[in-house]
C-alpha cells in the first residue's frame, strides 16, 4: 500500500478559504501536516465587506483537530500582505492555492465596466499579486507548488459570464507561463477547473444539482498537485463529483497555402475543410511544438 501523502514542514496559503473549496483545501492540507494560512475577506458571493468570521471558523476547525492555522482577511489585490503575514506567522511559504473569487453575472450588452474590472481585480490580478509576492521565496528555497483556479466557464464559455469566463481562461495562460519559468527551480504550477457546491455555484445551480458535487471531492486533486512527489506542471484539470480529467490543446494538421502570388480570401475558403479537419490532430504542448509549421516554412535559421 502507498504511504500516506504528508505535508509536514510545509506551509500553505489558501485564498478564499473561509468556505466551499478553499475551506476543504485548507482542512485537508492541515489534516496531513501542513501549517495553513486561511485567507478570506468574509464577503458574500458578489464581493464587498470584510468579516474575519469565516476564516476564523476554519482556523478553529483546524486547531480543534490538532493542526496549525492562522486567519487572514487581506485582499488578494494586496498580495504582498498575505505573503508577509504567512512569513511572519510560519517563517516560510511552500504552497499557494489561488482560490479567491466571486461572481458578477450579467449579459454582455448590459455589462458595466465595473462588472468587468471587479472580476479582473480578484480572479486574475489578485492571483498575479499573491503569486508575484510569493515567487521570490519559492525560487530561493527551490521548492514551490502553485494551484490556480479556473472554471468550465473559462474553458467553454457561458452566457452572462464574459467577465468571469475571460479571467478564468486567462488564469490558465498565467499557469502555463509560470510552469515554464518555474520548472528549473522546482516550482510547479497547475490549474484546476472545479465543479462543486460553493457560495458561487449556489447562485447559479439548484441544491439538487449540487448534492453530489461536494467540495471534498475536489481538494484531493489540489493537494496531490501540491505534494513534492507530484511532478506535474502546466496542467489543466477538470474535477468534480468524484471525476477527474486532464485537458490539452488540440490543433488540426492545417493547410499549407501557395504564397507565390499572395494568399486570397478565396484560397482560405477553398482550404477550409482541411483547415478544420481534426482527424490526425496534433497536441502541441510547448511554444516549440506549436511553432513547428512556421519553422518548416522559414527553414533553418
Describe each model-derived feature in a short phrase.
Residues 62, 107-108, 112-117:
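Substrate-binding pocket helix/loop in short-chain dehydrogenase/reductase
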Residues 25, 31-32, 140, 156, ...:
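Active-site-adjacent segment of SDR/Rossmann-fold oxidoreductases
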Residues 131-132, 176:
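A short, exposed helix-loop element centered on a Lys and neighboring polar residues
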Residues 3-38:
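Canonical Rossmann dinucleotide-binding motif of NAD(H)/NADP(H)-dependent dehydrogenases/reductases
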Residues 59, 63, 69-73, 77-91:
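Conserved amphipathic alpha-helix within the SDR
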Amino acid at each position: 500500500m502507498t504511504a500516506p501523502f504528508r505535508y509536514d514542514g510545509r506551509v500553505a496559503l489558501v485564498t478564499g478559504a473561509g468556505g466551499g473549496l478553499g475551506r476543504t483545501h485548507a482542512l485537508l492540507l492541515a489534516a496531513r501536516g501542513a501549517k495553513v494560512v486561511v485567507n478570506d475577506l468574509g464577503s458574500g458571493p458578489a464581493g464587498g465587506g470584510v468579516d474575519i468570521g469565516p476564516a476564523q471558523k476554519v482556523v478553529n476547525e483546524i486547531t480543534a483537530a490538532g493542526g496549525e492555522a492562522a486567519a487572514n482577511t487581506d485582499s488578494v489585490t494586496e498580495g504582498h500582505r498575505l505573503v508577509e503575514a504567512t512569513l511572519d506567522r510560519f517563517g516560510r511559504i511552500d504552497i499557494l492555492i489561488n482560490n479567491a473569487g466571486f461572481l458578477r453575472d450579467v449579459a454582455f450588452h448590459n455589462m458595466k465596466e465595473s462588472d468587468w474590472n471587479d472580476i479582473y481585480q480578484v480572479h486574475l490580478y489578485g492571483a498575479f499579486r499573491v503569486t508575484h509576492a510569493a515567487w521570490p521565496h519559492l525560487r530561493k528555497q527551490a521548492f514551490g507548488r502553485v494551484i490556480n483556479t479556473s472554471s468550465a466557464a473559462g474553458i467553454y464559455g457561458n452566457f452572462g459570464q464574459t467577465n468571469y469566463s475571460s479571467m478564468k481562461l486567462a488564469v490558465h495562460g498565467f499557469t502555463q507561463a509560470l510552469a515554464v519559468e518555474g520548472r528549473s527551480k522546482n516550482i510547479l504550477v497547475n490549474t484546476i477547473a472545479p465543479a462543486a457546491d460553493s457560495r458561487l455555484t449556489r447562485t447559479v445551480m439548484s441544491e439538487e444539482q449540487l448534492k453530489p458535487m461536494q467540495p471534498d471531492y475536489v481538494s484531493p486533486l489540489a493537494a496531490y498537485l501540491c505534494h513534492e512527489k507530484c511532478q506535474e506542471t502546466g496542467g489543466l484539470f477538470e474535477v468534480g463529483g468524484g471525476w477527474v480529467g486532464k485537458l490539452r490543446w488540440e490543433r488540426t494538421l492545417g493547410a499549407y497555402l501557395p504564397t507565390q502570388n499572395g494568399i486570397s480570401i478565396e484560397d482560405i475558403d477553398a482550404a477550409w475543410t482541411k483547415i478544420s479537419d481534426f482527424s490526425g490532430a496534433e497536441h502541441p504542448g510547448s511554444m516549440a511544438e506549436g511553432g513547428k509549421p512556421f519553422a518548416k516554412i522559414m527553414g533553418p535559421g
